[in-house]
Amino acid sequence: MQNPARSAATEAPDSGYSGGDSLKPAAPVGLLVSNGWLASIFLAFLSSAGLYYVNIFPVIVDALMAGAGLSAEQAGQITFSNTMGAVIGAFTVSWLIRHIPRWKRAAAILLCCSIGMDVLTIQLANLDLLIPLRLVHGMLGGALVGLGFAVIARSGIAGRSYSMVLLVQYIGGFFGVRFLPALVAEHGTYVPFYALITFSTLTLLMLPLIANYPLPTAEESRVQAENRVPLPMLPFAVTLLALFCFQFANMALFAFIFDLGRSFDLPQSFISLTVSWASLIAIGGAALAAFTGQKLPLAKPLAIALVITLVGLMLFVFSNIRPVFILANVVTGMTWAFCVPYFLTMASRFDSAGQMGAFGGFASKLGLACGPLVAGYFITGGGSYTQLIIVATAVLAVCLAAVPAAARLDR
């Protein structure tokens, strides 16, 4: 008997994990072949530009706490406003995807407005205005990420492109975490926002080189609707919940990783070097996801990676031992880069226009927003980092509920 989850999933563009082609990739329209590796890289930049601040969250948080004298709670509120804005933007664009045929124009407008908000943040240099400014910036960035995820979902190269998103983010995160702290110490609190402007500008220059990846035509939508087998929403809901919990747990620790390290008497230079190199090594996780996505089904690699992540998070309890702190950062970095493409690919298989892929982006942003906020309140309220590590590990354990859903998609 045919599995309904599998039937509906295969109506979405091939993610790279299923081993089959459900829709042909979009025809070449831009200056690039629409299903090539360069296309995946440029799509990854498009989907990362509105999210790059997440990869340098530790630098931003530490700059606000050490440079501007804010508490963990205040820094958490500012980062929450940025990421909560992204949640609002991603959620809004998820409902509008089918009504944005000229997505390149929309992306260009969002990028220009995001650059403008970063310029305002630097020029005004007013901590009281940071929350509203970063909220608006987050809304623009979230809409851009949701738009990018939707385009990837209908590109025909979703699995590879989602892996490239993590690859781009971790490379950018490496350079940010490696070099920005020293620049912040030399030039001031607002240096990270110059990095955001640079990333957005590069993406804006790449935009004309990306193929069009149009929405399905009315006839294609009609044929798909006639052939579609109704899909129970439970697997999709579980996927979104798992993606939320995964991002929540990881970001709750990552956003405060500098302060966490200092609480275990680790020197700032050691923490910065460890986190930056761990971010670079974590690129291997995204590369591995791209490889296994072409060769293996979803469930088994995802289950193994989630178990390894649980172990990696618990290793942070022993951060006073330097090799263990290094190992914890490397392990969780690699599994973070590995698991997110799998969750996003699962979400993208539920429709052909990319709307469900955009909802996956919404769940991801919600987790990224709530993690630092809850962690900030927890630490300011008197909780220890050891307790926070245990809480984050418990939240991440919920993600194991997505393994049966992945197995169902594999059948």
Residue ranges and their predicted role:
Residues 57-58, 235-276:
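Extracytoplasmic gate region of multi-pass secondary transporters
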Residues 135-168:
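Cytoplasmic helix-loop-helix junction between adjacent transmembrane helices
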Residues 155, 164-215:
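Helix-loop-helix hairpin linking two adjacent transmembrane segments in secondary transporters
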Residues 350-384, 392:
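A late C-terminal transmembrane helix in Major Facilitator Superfamily
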